[in-house]
Each structure stands twice: as C-alpha cells, then as structure tokens.
Amino acid sequence: MLYRLPSVGQSDAVTVSAPVAVIGPPDPAAAFTAALDQAGLASIRYDEFPVDLSGYSAVIVVAGRYPEPERLDVAGLAEYVRAGGSAYVEFALDDTGFLPQGEIRTAHIERIFTTVALAGIEPLQILDEHSSQAQQVVVRGKAVELCSYGTVAGTHEAIFGPPDVTFPALLDIPVGDGRLLYATTALSHHVKGRYKPVRRWRRLLQVIVGQLTGVQLAEDIEVFTEPRVWVATGEPVKLVVRSSTKPVAELDLVETKPGRFESDLQYLDDGEHTFAVGDQHVTVAVGPRAERYRRMVDRAIAWYDRAGMFYDAPDGSKGVAEGLSNEIDAEGKLPFRPVPRGDCFTQTAHAFRMYADLADFPRGRTIADNLMRLVVEEEQLTDRNQLYGSFEPRGARTDLTGTNNLFADDNGWISLFALMSGHVESGLRGVEALIRTSSADLGLQVDPWRTPSTLLVKGWDELSRSPIEDGLDLTSHWQSSAQCAYLYAYGLTGDQGYLDIATRGLDHMAGQHPRARLETSRTCEAGRFLLPLVGAYHYTRKPQYLETMRSLAGYLKSRQGPDGGFAEWDGKCPPSNEAYGVDEAAIFAANGDPVTDQLYGTPFAAWALPLAYRITGEPVFEELAHGVLDYLSRIQIDDPDDEQLDGTWQRAFDFDSWEYFGSNADLGWGPYCVETGWSVAPSIIGAMLYLTGDNFFPPAPSSLSELPASIRAEFDAIAAGQPAPATFTRRDDGRVIRIQNGVQAVLGDLTAAGEPVWARNEPVGADEIYVRGTDGHLHHTYLDDRVGQGRWQQLGDLELADEPVVAFNPGANAIEVYVLGADGHIHHCSMIDVRGGHTPWEPVGTLHFTGSPAVLYDEELGSVRLVANDTAGQDRRTRKVNRWHLPWQDYSHWITA
C-alpha cells in the first residue's frame, strides 16, 4: 500500500502558493531545494529560523554541522507544527523534548531501507549511506517508521526481509494538528557523501517534499542510449526511455515491455549526437575503437599521478600504493590505501612499461624499472628455509614474525611479471617456490594461503603429498596466476617441467569444468580461467583447452549486458542478514543483480579475451573482447573536478542504474574501492594488448636454458639442509646486503655509516650482524639458520666514534661486542640470551683510545683478549675474565724499533 500523509489543518496565512522555508547552510540545503524545484515549489533559504514561520507551506531544517549534530532552539518550530504545520528536521538536538533523542553512533554495517511503500520507492529498498552518523532513537506513540537502519543483505532490495534488530532512520510523527518528519541522520548529506544509488536518494527527498506539501510527485523518467556513452564507428545504437506512459521524443518509440520504450536501431556518423525526450537530453559519442581505447589508457595512466598513487616520488622509486579503500568518508572521499603490495607493484610496472612503448613515454620505463627493483630487492624471501623464493606480498620483507601469508595468487602474479621484466632468476625462484608448495599429482596449490608457519612446519615434501581440500583444485581465483607464471617460464627457458606442471593442473580443471569453487562468483572464475588456458593452448594446441575456452566464452556471452559488461552470477553472497558484512564477499546479492566486478572479474576478462582471439582466431573471442573493452571505456570515471577518481574504475558498477554501486558486504574490498593492481593495471594491459597486437606469452622456445636446473639445485640444497655461509657488506646507498650462495638480499631499511661486522653464534645456529648506523648508534640483526633474517635493533643510546668489533666467546656462549664511543672510551656489551638479549653498555676502564680494539678469543686461556692504542700512543691490552675486564696493561715497552 502506498503510504500518504493524511491531510492536516493549515493556518489561515498558509496558501498553496506559499513558499517552503529551508533552514541551514547552502550546501546541504541544495539537496532539498533541488527536490523542491523538481516539484515546482518556491523556497526561501535561511541560515537561522525566521521569527515567524506561519507564512510558509512547510519548513525543512537540514543538518548544518554533520557529522556532528546541531543543537536547535525549536520553540517556534514546535508551535508551528502543533498549529497544523508540516516540518522536516534531521540529525539535531534540542532541550525541550520536541525532537526525538538517542545515542549518536556510527552505522558501520547497517544501511537504510524503506519499511513502507513510498511514492516511487517500494518497501525494503536499500539506500547505502556509507557509515553515516545516526541517532539510535526509539519509536514512540503514533509515530510511523518510514525508513529504518538495519543490517540487511541485498543490492537494491533487502532480499531476506527486515532484520531482527533495527532503529529508525526516518519517522513520521503526529504533533498536535501537524506532522513532524524526523530523520535520525542527515539525509541531505547524500550528495556530498556520495550515497548510492543516486536516483533513489533523490527520490527519497522528493518523497519528503511531497509528504510535507501534499504536492503530487512527477514520475521519475529515465532516458538513455543503448549502448550508453559511446558506440564504435559503424555499430548501431538505440534510444531507450523508462516511463509508465509513452513519452514525446524526436524518434519514434515502441513499448518493448511494460514501462520500457525503444527506438529503432540508429547508425550514426562519427561525432556526438544528442537526443531529446521531453525536457531531458542524452548524448552519445561515435568513433573508432582504437581512439577510444587509447583515450581510456591515457586517462588511466594520468590517474596514477593525479590521485597520488606514487606517494611523493613520481618516478616510482618509493613504490605504488594499493589504491583507495571502500569506506567513503563524510567529505565524500575514499581513504588512501598506502599498502605496498607486490602484486600491485608488478602489474602497474608492466602497464607502465607497455605504455612507455605505446606512447613514447620514457618515464613509464623508469617507473616500471623502479617498481620491479623494489619487488626483487626488497620483497623476495632469500632465507634458506621453506619460504625461500617466495615474495612478501605486503611490502618489504622483515623477520619471520612480520611475514604475511605468501598468497599463491599474489606470488603467481609477482613471479610472472618478474620474468616479463627481465628479472629472470628472481622470477624463476618465485616459480620454483610455487611448484614446491603444489600437489605432486595435480600441480595445483595445496594451500593457496601459504602461511609461513604451515610451510615451515610441514615442509615442501609433506605439502606436495597433501590432499587439496575444499574445492581449491577447481578455483582459477587461486590457481591461475601460478599457472600463467609456469607457462611464461616455459616460454622463456624451454624447460619442459614448467609446461608439464601447468598442463597437469589445467587438464584437471578443464576436465572438471564447469564445476568450480566460487571464490567470488562464477563470472569472475570464468574471466580468470581464460588466461592460463590461452597460454597453454598457445604452446600445446590441445583441443581440450580450446573447447574449455569456447565454453567459457558461451558462459560470458550469456551474462553480457547491453553495454558489454559481464554480470556477476552464482556468487559468494551472504546467505542471511546476519551474514552480511562479516567476511569477504561478492559485490552482488542475488542472480539478476545488474552488477559487474572491476576487481576480480572484468579486468582479467579484458586482459585474456584479446589474446584468446589472437591465438585462436575465433570471432567469438573478438566479439567478447570488443564488448568488455567497450564497457570499460564507457564506465571509466569521467569527472575532471575529482582528482581522486577521474580516470579510474571502482569495484562494483550497476549497469542498469549506470553508477558505481553494489552490495557492500565485503569486509575488505567493497563496491567503492579502487586498486592500482587487479583493477586499473589489468584493465589497461588488456586495452594495450588489443592496441599493440602483443601475444603476451613468448613464442614457443627453440633452445633450452640451463638456469632452471641451477634454480632447482638451490632449493634442493635447502631441502637437504646444506649450509651456505653468508657475507655482509654495505652498498653505495648505505643499505646493508647479504650475499649467500650468490643470492643477494637487502637487510631492512637501515642506512649504515660503516661496514657491517658479524660473528657466528654456533650454539643457536645463527650469524650475529652489527653495524654503525648513520644515526651514530650501533644496530644489530641476525641470520638464523631456520627462521632466517631478523630485524635491525638499536643497541642503547651510546654514540659511536668508530666501527664495532665482535667475537664469539665459547667460554660464555656469548657474543662480545666492543666499540669506541664518542667519549673516547672503549665500551662493551655481551649478547648472552638466545635472541637479542644484549647487556647494557659499560666502559672498559677509564682510558681514552683512538679507535676500536682488536679482539680475539684466546683458546689457551679461555678468555677474550683486547688490544688497542690509547690517545698517548701507548699499546694497551686487557682480557675479559668471566664477566669482568682486567685493568688495561701498557705493552708499549715490548715494541722495538
């Protein structure tokens, strides 16, 4: 039933032509004045309440200090309403009890939904308000709850009905002879806050205006072209109108289904064309695909700079940020997500390397080189244990306690692009690390999360013999990137082992197709499965791979919308209201939601489909490639005033309401997030593959490289427990590097002032490393035979004047550390605990010296001996007995001419 306000008495001063008073600052007031204009109603805005409200047909009071509530003096307003007036107030406080009051809280997971039918909005329709501030009030008396807050699963509609726990969002409260509409949050904030879906929010404010004034609301007519925005030269377009009655238009319109009117197909010349329907206009551009795709790439490349994705180093030398988080703030901005992800680094690097060649853009190659250098030098794990060769996916490597899960999908992409960028040894180590954690039978990842503890406890051999559980053998989400890396390694080296492990896994997955584990959705799985199949077919021409690609193409075709995108289907969607917002999830709620995924689906389809056509020559792949790339070009955000988003894509796009919107159930990457990798880079890689005709995978190899055998030998030596002595040195930039079995690793971000020194701590199986930092203090780390490299730790506040010297003291099972302090004294500490337990600094006597001492362990005496020159030029010697140093002795008289 349609909810309508009953008629109420009006004062003699109020007439149908009386204006509406809008109280509040211009920006939030504009949301309501737009609704009033739409209804043909006059309004007057005030910063403060007028003294006399009796001359107004209604009063609207917007929140002027949101996200903080504003305390109002409502005495005059209360009198106006009780006398028969109608008023709307939002998110405010008063001391009289006229306005509902309640605890103010953030609606983190809850969203607003309609509880009754409103004009043009059905019950249970969702309005996403992005963690708004709200008052948790209680419905009292005869108040009617028009909209509620609650944890509801659904995209446009609360598909499981209202939740058990709700609180009001919009109330209709009888007061005396009048009515008060009260919103517990600032509904007027929907414009600045970018609330979605936009048309529904606009309609809600129009409904409020209609309820306040009794004005009949105009029908909400929608006019668009199909396809929208742009169409390729020589391809047709039609005009579409959604309306309950046939509209007046330039073109003849035919009702194709209730409420939908279409024109005949139009073939238009290149250029822009505008169609008018009543007082509404819609424009579509026509032009060549190559120009459109190139424009799309140019704008996406420019977005990286404009949005600050390279931090404060435009050459990429500090990396690239992950992107923008999902949680839109009160200013309508997305939080910057600075996480330095290796997969984002490498995908972005490849996109910029391709763009450097496409656009003669030398800076692109500089950015690519710097990003790949950071990944190879800073993120690859080189400690000689079961983590060897893997890449830390969330920034520079640190010690074992700080190492993240070595996710198989992230590591697959990083390894692939390391190979493509010319870092072949590093890439092959990444590939071998993935092979060692795969099933010996199927060649697929056993545990794609690859937690460090699992790898270290189980080891490579046990992992390879473990069963693959939970359908993880049938998910391209987790398996495809490693398969692509294997295939690329084969193309580079000719080593049959790489092709064999890739095809073993693909044979299994293709043989089970269309069965799949739906990590995100069936549509995303299809888009992700294509790329390794393309690579495998490229090298083998195996009919099974082509048939599987054709099947995937048929599925994608069945899910393709009129603008080219592939709708999400069969997803990991919350099965109840209670399950909403508690885990990673798809960005749609039910099959039929017109939503595409620009994080896990669309970009990967855009990447693979041009290659599928190039390698197979089958028209269906070209048609699908055109469709998905056309779609990406249409939905690319085009708003020059928005530096944060202009030129990029957000995760969820609703191609029916034509805006970025989707189910906001995903805890990590919701519908409004932006990723430099996974989304932007793969999208433009796909476009540039189309533009350049590049095959992506190398040609079939004609010779065999010896490098894979040497890489496997490194892993075999680690598995056998063979030792590999390490040396340490200072680079020109001050970073300390470790060289072990010819493999280099940068040790943290410490900048050293001198050369490192180290001693073997045999009882604990580690090397202890010390260096003077540019801060003048001594720093220590370790290389443990099992758990690997530690973090740098500063040893006290002592200021050094020279380099440290160290020696292992087997009599005490301790590392003895000596330095010359800035005070001229020699200072000592011992490392007596298993890990990091250094004693406090203590001076060795009271003499002053010119440099650090020479130190050795005297096996005959069982003590540590020290030799140093004091400031008088005398040769001084002492030794450490137990934990004490004997007095310095003068040995100068033993020196002869």
Per-range role (PLM):
Residues 2-18, 153-242, 264, 270-272, ...:
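Extracellular ligand-binding/catalytic regions of CAZymes and related secreted enzymes
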Residues 21-99:
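Helical hinge/lid and interdomain linker segments adjacent to catalytic or ligand-binding clefts
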Residues 31, 107-181, 188-193:
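Catalytic beta-strand/loop cores that center a nucleophilic Ser/Cys/Thr
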Residues 66-137, 145:
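A glycine-rich, often tryptophan-bearing local segment used as a flexible ligand/cofactor-contacting loop or short
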Residues 218-220, 288-320, 417-420, 424-425, ...:
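Terminal, non-catalytic domain-edge segments
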Residues 285-344, 363-401, 429-464, 503, ...:
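Low-complexity, Ser/Thr/Pro/Gly-enriched N-terminal "stalk/linker" regions
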Residues 337-357, 399-422, 471-491, 521-538, ...:
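Well-ordered alpha-helical segments within folded domains of soluble proteins
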Residues 717, 721-897:
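A structural motif
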